Amino acid sequence: MKKSHIVSNIEKYYLNSLTKEVVWNLVGGKATINFATETKDAVGQVVFDMPLPDGDLAIYSTDALLRLINITSEEIQIELSKGPTGLVDKLKIQDNKFDLNYHLSDINSIPEVPKVAETDYDFNFKVDDEFITGFLKAHNALEKVKDVTLNTTTTKQGENVVEIVLGERSQHSHKVKFTELATFESPSDILPFSANVLREVLAANKGTEGNIYVSNKGLMKLEFNSEESKAKYFIVRQQ
């Protein structure tokens, strides 16, 4: 098993510590992880290849799990270990040097993930590495501002685009604006979202092309699919 495969998919829900407590649902050689950020402004699901026996694993401290995995070499083995009760209570992680144990938690200690009521989306656009790199650079240049707004418009050349503005839209604030080609039927409202959450989602999925769908009701959906994993996120607008 490749360490990089495991780490990259954990990071898709961990989002640089925005989510720590999750349940890994193992079925048919795949792990399905539903999650919510601690601030409850985003929920999502990550599905990836994980050749382990079927069952549910309660991960209370994803940051501790990542720290353990990150000291290993690229080729690792992961096994499930049962305690005296016959229930799985540890993840055993091994490489050619280390034998590591990660203690699993009681599944009832993991908060339930809120359900998302999807709606019709008013515009959508594609994202790739060029978009992600540009967004991260702009966010860093503004010292990781909290605000990002999106709205659609049609250029003088007749192109439908989404305008993305990092920073406050007030006249005297520092901000970065850029556009991407978008699909929509009518112009949208100006919709505010968390720049920090969007940043971490994009950073965790760098290297995978995706799509962003936005509703004027204040819901953003992001989807990233590859041969080995699928990631889906819902971010709610800021007030």
Predicted regions and their residues:
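DNA polymerase processivity clamps
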Residues: 1-102, 121-239
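Short, charged, solvent-exposed linker or helix-capping segments at domain edges/interfaces
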Residues: 102-103, 114
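Long, charge-dense
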Residues: 108-118
